[in-house]
């Protein structure tokens, strides 16, 4: 009865299956946690969604920014970009079923017994766990409702970037979405910076990675997250697990077995094209 946490899959279906075979994942007894961004960039987004959906209660996942963008494309709000390689999924006969399932997935996973929290980008230090839970439920309720296209149309944007319980309406939902799915850096007071994507050693002052700023959740729980592939799984404090290691860019797909904290990796089937900065089929 093992718990396996895997970083951003990004449509890398073959690597996902190979990694699960490597760890001898047994859906009947084991549980798979996925950090979000199941889709886009890799060649197998359709197969990834079909497989993950088939796991039923054996999987616990959170939505990432690429998953939300896919839903916006599906709703006719955003453009389908060729580099995301989503057309086979969008044109599949079961696309409606898969994407209506996807939009009903959570933004936050919490296991009180393990003292483990998972969100795609992390947990802003401005929130305690109760606030994070309430905020996740706010967005999840809209995404699972018939009015979800209205929300998806309004979710794009970088403001507001400072949490306040007084935030309401679409501004509140946009902040929550950015905090759960796009966050990397914060100012010392926890205010989000939505612009810098530099590696931590090159980040402009006074910005710090969100996990370098003490917060109520990180003080009491372990946090698993994805989203930030350039970290390469390194440089986080004890109890903070960065699991996106850039499989879709030619890196690796990383798995953490929770019970003994052992890591497993599956090399990408793609190799980095340094001229374009994009991974290509190997």
From Swiss-Prot:
Family classification: Belongs to the Ap4A hydrolase family.
Protein name from the UniProt record: Bis(5'-nucleosyl)-tetraphosphatase, symmetrical
Record keywords: Hydrolase
Gene, per the UniProt record: apaH
EC number of the protein: 3.6.1.41
Gene3D superfamilies, per database record: 3.60.21.10
HAMAP family, sorted: ApaH (MF_00199)
Organism: Salmonella paratyphi A (strain AKU_12601)
GO MF entries: bis(5'-nucleosyl)-tetraphosphatase (symmetrical) activity
Task performed by this protein: Hydrolyzes diadenosine 5',5'''-P1,P4-tetraphosphate to yield ADP.
Entry-linked NCBIfam families: apaH (TIGR00668), PRK00166.1 (NF001204)
Major enzyme class: hydrolase
Catalytic activity, reaction form: P(1),P(4)-bis(5'-adenosyl) tetraphosphate + H2O = 2 ADP + 2 H(+)
């Amino acid at each position: 009865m093992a718990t396996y946490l895997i970083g951003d899959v990004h449509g890398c279906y073959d690597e996902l299956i190979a990694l699960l075979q490597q760890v001898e994942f047994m859906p009947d007894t084991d549980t798979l946690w996925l950090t979000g961004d199941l889709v886009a960039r890799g060649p197998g987004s359709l197969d990834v969604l079909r497989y993950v959906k088939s796991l039923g209660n054996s999987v616990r996942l959170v939505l990432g920014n690429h998953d939300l963008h896919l839903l916006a494309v599906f709703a006719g709000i955003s453009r389908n970009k060729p580099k995301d390689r989503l057309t086979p999924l969008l044109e599949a006969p079961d696309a409606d079923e898969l994407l209506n399932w996807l939009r009903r997935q959570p933004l936050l996973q919490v296991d009180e017994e393990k003292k483990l929290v998972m969100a795609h980008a992390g947990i802003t230090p401005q929130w305690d766990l109760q606030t994070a839970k309430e905020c996740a439920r706010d967005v999840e309720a809209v995404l699972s409702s018939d009015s979800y296209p209205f929300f998806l149309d309004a979710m794009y944007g970088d403001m507001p970037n400072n949490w306040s319980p007084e935030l309401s309406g679409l501004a509140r939902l946009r902040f929550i979405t950015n905090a759960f799915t796009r966050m990397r850096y914060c100012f010392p007071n926890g205010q989000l910076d939505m612009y810098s994507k530099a590696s931590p050693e090159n980040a402009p002052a006074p910005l710090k990675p969100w996990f370098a700023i003490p917060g109520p959740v990180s003080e009491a729980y372990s946090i698993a997250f994805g989203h930030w592939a350039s970290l390469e799984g390194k440089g986080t404090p004890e109890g903070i697990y960065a699991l996106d290691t850039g499989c879709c860019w030619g890196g690796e797909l990383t798995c953490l077995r929770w019970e003994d904290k052992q890591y497993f990796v599956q090399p990408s089937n793609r190799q980095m094209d340094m001229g374009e900065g994009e991974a290509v089929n190997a």
